[in-house]
Amino acid sequence: MDVSSLPEEAALGARFYDEGKEGDALEILKKYGANSLRIRLWNDPYSEDGKPYGAGTSDFTKLVALASAGKKLGYSYLLDLHYSDFWADPGKQFPPKEWAYADANALEKYVYDYTKDVLLKLKRLDLLPEMVQVGNEITNGLMWPHGKWDNVDNIARFIS
């Protein structure tokens, strides 16, 4: 159950109900059998002048808040590392703006360092995920052009 947008939805006024009674979305989901969450992480989901891109603004702060709330309710979670600043899917796989001009060798190092940094921060917070998804919907590769689908050697380097 991907809950990455819940904080933004709540901030915009969304309310969640169970049989007509307002409640916490995670508690309602738990009541009906949900036991694991999917939380996405975008590298830097903000414009150059600091405005959020929206769609959940899935940054590290939101990840920690959702993982903490889920942990309190007994959820496990999958961390989805997009390696992008916004949506990555089969039709577009843009590297984070900070990595935009990197070559494949640099991208390999950036992915490794970023992944390690995120996981070490989560470990210090006692919020390590049960599963990690490297990339999002990477059918056609990731971090184009260096990781486009026809460059399988680079894709393997980036995700191993």
Predicted regions and their residues:
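Conserved, mostly hydrophobic/aromatic
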Residues: M1, L29, D80, V132
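Glycine-rich, proline-tolerant flexible connector loops at the mouths of alpha/beta enzymes
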Residues: I39-T57
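A short acidic, helix-capping loop that chelates divalent metal ions and anchors anionic groups
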Residues: E9-A11, S47-D49, G141-M143
